[in-house]
Amino acid sequence: MTRLAQIAVITKLSLMLAACGGGSTGDGLSTLVPTAGSPTDQESSLLTASDGGCDGRCSESEEHLTEADVAQIVGQVIAEAEARGLPGTVAVVDRVGNVLAVFEMAGAAKVVTITSSHDGSSPVMGGLEGVNIIPATLAAIAKAITGAYLSTEGNAFSTRTASQIVQENFNPGETNQPSGPLFGVQFSQLPCGDLVQRARGGGLTMVGPHRSPLGLSADPGGFPLYKQGTPVGGVGFIGDGIYGLDRDISEFDDDLDEIIALAGTVGFDAPAARRADVITAVGKTFRYADWDTSSLLTDSASAEPISISDDPRGQLASVFGYYNDSTIVTGTAFGTPESGIAPAPAGLLRSASGEELDAFVLVDSEGSNRFPPRQGTDQPGNGDTEPLRAEEVQVILEEAMTLANRMRAQIRRPLGTQARVSISVVDTNGAVLGFARTRDGPMFGADVSLQKARTAVFFSGTGQGIAQSPADTLRGLPAPKYLAPVFEPEAVADDFSQRLVPALQEESPLTAPAPEISDYVVAAQRFLGIPDALERSGSPSAFADRSGGNLSRPHYPDGVASNPNGPLSKARGEWSVFSVGLQLDLVYNSLIQHVAHVTLDGAVPDVGETCPGNTGFDPDDLFQMQGEATQLANGIQIFPGSVPIFRGETLVGGIGVSGDGVDQDDMISFLGVHQAGLRLNQALNNAPPGIRADQIVLPDSLPRLRYVSCPQTPYLDSDEDNVCRGL
């Protein structure tokens, strides 16, 4: 390679800094901003790009979905749907969740039913189960967002992958197996959250990440979209009227939603070497699709793109608060300020040795960092302990980021690339004190990392002198008001404005089941054998998200079918992915209000930016906020990846990490706090070992809770093992 060619390659790569991101840099070990490496390394990166397998530095920053792309993708989906005789609704989003098009085919069902028992299994009552007035447009958007948010340049996951990893057993259909690695992730990106953004409408995109109307979807029929190996968005289709999941993956399904949505990916395919079906966890291979494109009945390349008006196949459909039907929208380029994800300001995050870290942040519409490091807003220990300082938050983020850039990823390809994650730090009020992310972490991890951090802090508040104890906070929240199925939902959908509320009033809210949030407090205290657990007067206990997740499984220990449920979970026969327990019950009423807001075109006000505390569909107190828990504003999360932060024996905050394997997330949070404490001369620390949840002796000789679990040999640049032992 000539010197001029070397310079050209280096210049090209430097332009990629703000682009899609992910994977390794040359040897895969650098924690620094990319610099000009050897010509051999740089040539290798470009060759990888030409193979369609990006490693994070192989596309220009302008890579995005154009209007023509979106029109073609939707046209391909419609052609396959027509060929199979299943009219439906299709949605396309960009990588940060801007809705670019929603198309409703002629004859498509307008509403869908949420159910986990469409396979003929015994139906579950309560939660979201049986709710049958969900607009199909919202289901299609949720599917598209899921395909986009779970995928990166290192992995391509679909809604079928999501179905596999959120159920009570991994794999679904097996018995006496632990739950899915992302158990509970379906209740993230919630429309009532405070981190996710809200669309402005009018055919304009705005900074993300955006909220999803139904959280993340486990219903097959949602896929990521790629251009030149770079993820640029997602596509979702629903036509069968069921918003469900696959409860048994021992066979391959003939799910028409899935094959029809798959048609939209032709020409925008995920690289085969990045798809879920080449990625494993605990020795099991993920699923991407139960079809392949050879099963398509149509030639997608020759499919007619949709037109904005006078399309005989159907029409663009307005979705209040998400999409205006007057135009097809161009997507944003991920990693640029317009997307809401941008390189961290120069000098913001540095390693312990002073080298600048390759980090990204969330930015607002002006390009300013939304969550720069700041001091805590709380008064830890009844005001006797200093809150986290801004410089301490910065060091925590730096140490966590350094660890991520050293660690071997679990769910990325090629093998040997770095973990890619989002990192949130909060105080005891749940206020965000700082946020950072690696170059190509999956988009879902931003909101989830914040959920995780807040969850660890909240459940570690026993005996910490916090103004309102966890128990008192939960007791003050209104009960979820579960909806019953309505009679003739399609007739209701023909005139939502006049028929929806009367139809709901006939049977809703359900009188059984009708849990109270306070029930979970009582159940937790009994299960733990600690009458004052979660109380202001109780003895301090520290709960990582792995610990709280143990308590939130339908079996304890996790996966043992003959055992009872954890205290924060529904019992057998009442539990499903759509009715999990405390996690959903905290946010249920806000979800329903948001659906009503969209369905009735704004006649019902939209939810605020705090999910818990909504009175729900209560005719006497309709959708009011009561005793809201702002410290859990975007809901709780129940899979691992967070720890509380202490100053001595006093709780001062928490850190949450999400985006890679859950053991990696655990280690980055736990070891990140430890390393930050060392760097800050022990000014902060992990929870004292004696008060960690794994020290609680449970009644009836039940196995102990878990606190964190770190990978055995985690580093790319060292064979050091058991790095969390003894800390």
In which residue ranges do the predicted regions lie?
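C-terminal motif of bacterial Sec signal peptides marking the signal peptidase cleavage site
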Residues: 16-19
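Surface-exposed loop and adjacent secondary-structure segments within mature catalytic domains
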Residues: 28-29
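Bacterial signal peptide processing site
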Residues: 21-25
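Terminal low-complexity, poorly structured segments
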Residues: 9-13, 42-43
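Flexible, solvent-exposed loop/hinge segments and secondary-structure transition points
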Residues: 37-727
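Bacterial N-terminal signal peptides that target proteins for export
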Residues: 1-11
